[in-house]
Design a protein with these regions (language model features):
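Pyridoxal 5′-phosphate
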Residues: 17
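Intrinsically disordered, low-complexity regulatory regions enriched in serine/threonine/proline
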Residues: 1-8, 12, 31-156
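Short, well-structured beta-strand/strand-turn elements
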Residues: 21-29
């Protein structure tokens, strides 16, 4: 069931990412410029009807990978880490669990709104390594895949 929902989400989100210059491949979108590559991925749970929304930032200057994927990114996190409060995060977990609660279309619409209002501005505001290092939205608990040290070296 989660793969069917993932496909519906991909269709709804496609025009938003296309407008940002992202290219779609499978359940992922990516775009790159000289300094950063940005990724967004929809991941279906193997054990339930939950869906995860992964975000990644890759520092191009490292040239570690020619075509980086979300797993290669130096900064990786889930979209709920962009939410402002514990209540918003709890509500998002309920939205992304398609085993219960609101009907599927209502959940998809709410998830689309969160992505438009939280992730799209994040991608729009973060275009350089300096933007990432100086951002209040980038939290210490987000997963840095050796990225913090690299970013600091690249920025200096």
């Amino acid at each position: 069931m989660s793969s069917v929902i993932s496909k519906k989400l991909q269709e709804v989100l496609k025009p938003h990412f296309k407008a940002l210059g992202f290219k779609k491949k499978g359940a992922s979108w990516g775009c790159a410029d000289d300094e950063l590559a940005k990724w967004f991925n929809i991941q279906c749970s193997r054990n339930s009807d939950s869906i995860y929304f992964n975000v990644g930032i890759y520092f191009q200057a490292t040239q570690e990978v020619d075509y980086p994927k979300e797993l290669d990114c130096h900064l990786r996190f889930r979209i709920e880490q962009l939410l402002s409060s514990d209540d918003e995060i709890r509500d998002f977990y309920e939205l992304s669990n398609f085993e219960s609660g609101l009907n599927i279309e209502a959940k998809i619409e709410k998830i689309e709104n969160i992505i438009i209002n939280k992730l799209v501005p994040f991608f729009t505001l973060h275009n350089t390594v300096a933007d990432i290092l100086n951002s209040e939205q980038v939290k210490p608990y987000m997963f840095w895949n050796n990225g913090k040290e690299l970013a600091t070296k690249l920025f200096v």
